[in-house]
């Protein structure tokens, strides 16, 4: 089937009480493997390119490869930019055919984060892309994540003034492997969800690697509909390579390298399968996709200074021949 709108995927997650996995890639051979495993599981999936990966994986090439693989599948597939480095990169992802983009202004001052995220939202919506913002920085240890958790009232102000469709929250989650068991602040997550309910903004959890299953399920109950995974996938992929090299320490012929890479991909796909089961997204095919009822509250355009307008684009335009099904 054609690529699906990210917001349609998230809407179904919210209605049916599960989360979609957002799986980072670092090569053009990975989307097909991941989508095949998602197809086997009957699970929707978001295939994600992080902003830092653009020099290695061209956005347009990535979008075309992923869209081609999605057409062969019967499960909903979206393409997402994670942690977009700046507005220019975010625009390139929109033009390439991503169905959603994340502009990460979390390291900026609050007002500058609001200002630039609002520009990203205006730009993304003119391309038909959903836009994710981040409030509260994701650290790499307990020491720094406790200092920068998302404030519920600030989250309300941020969403109201920017109009973001998806908000990445910091509630004790972190990138990379956790040193010990992560302690998610569920009370804070519940407060954030209640604060944002009038605005139709979806919540996403980054740093999903290593979070226990009961914490994942509780997070979903409290409104998380998208969970990002990368570290675990890389770890399992590397284990696949190591296992292959242990069995075949010397060059074995023309298929040696392809077989080694296939072992790595199998590790990636196994990680996706484990996560999809934990996120309760298996067996969720196309039925019921569609936008949520109720209209999203528009951003408060009087809440800040004027921002530059961007050139208008046709709604739903997708560069490079990539498109998604706008009738789902």
Task: State what each model feature region is.
Residues 53-55, 108-110, 233-238:
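Short gly/pro/ser/thr-enriched loop/turn and capping motifs at secondary-structure boundaries
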Residues 6-16, 26-52, 60-76, 84-199, ...:
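Alpha/beta enzyme core
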Residues 20-24, 79-80, 102, 203-206, ...:
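Short catalytic-loop micro-motif centered on adjacent basic/acidic residues
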Residues 80, 132-134, 204, 275:
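Generic enzyme active-site microenvironment
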Residues 212-328:
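C-terminal alpha-helical cap/extension of soluble enzyme domains
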Residues 18-26, 50-54, 259, 263:
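A short N-terminal beta->alpha junction/helix N-cap motif
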Residues 55-71, 262-274:
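Ligand-binding grooves and catalytic loops that recognize ribose/phosphate and carbohydrate rings
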């Amino acid at each position: 089937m054609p690529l699906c709108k990210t917001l349609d995927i998230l809407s179904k997650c919210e209605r049916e009480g599960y989360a979609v996995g957002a799986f980072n890639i670092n090569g053009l051979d990975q989307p097909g493997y991941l989508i095949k495993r998602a197809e086997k599981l009957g699970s929707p999936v978001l295939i994600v390119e992080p902003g830092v990966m653009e020099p290695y994986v061209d956005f347009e090439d990535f979008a075309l490869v992923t869209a081609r693989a999605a057409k062969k599948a019967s499960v909903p597939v979206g393409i997402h930019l994670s942690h977009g480095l700046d507005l220019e990169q975010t625009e390139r992802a929109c033009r390439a055919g991503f169905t959603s983009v994340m502009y990460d202004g979390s390291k900026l001052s609050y007002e500058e984060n609001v200002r630039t995220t609002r520009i990203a939202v205006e730009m993304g919506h003119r391309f038909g892309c959903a836009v994710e913002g981040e409030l509260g920085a994701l650290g790499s240890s307990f020491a720094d994540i406790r200092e920068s958790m998302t404030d519920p009232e600030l989250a309300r102000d941020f969403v109201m003034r920017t109009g973001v469709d998806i908000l990445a929250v910091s509630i004790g989650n972190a990138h990379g492997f956790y040193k010990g068991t992560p302690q998610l602040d569920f009370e804070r997550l519940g407060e954030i969800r209640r604060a944002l309910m009038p605005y139709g903004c979806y919540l996403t959890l980054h740093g999903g690697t290593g979070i226990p299953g009961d914490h994942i399920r509780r997070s979903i109950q409290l409104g998380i509909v998208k969970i990002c995974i990368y570290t675990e996938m890389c770890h399992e992929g590397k284990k696949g390579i190591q296992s292959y090299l242990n069995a075949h320490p010397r060059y074995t012929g023309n298929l040696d390298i392809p077989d080694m890479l296939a072992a790595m991909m199998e590790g990636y796909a196994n990680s996706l399968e484990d996560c999809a089961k934990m996120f309760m997204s298996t067996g969720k095919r196309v039925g019921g996709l569609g936008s949520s009822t109720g209209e999203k509250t528009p951003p408060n355009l009087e809440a800040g200074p004027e921002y530059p307008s961007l050139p208008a684009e046709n709604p739903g335009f997708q560069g490079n021949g990539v498109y998604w099904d706008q009738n789902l």
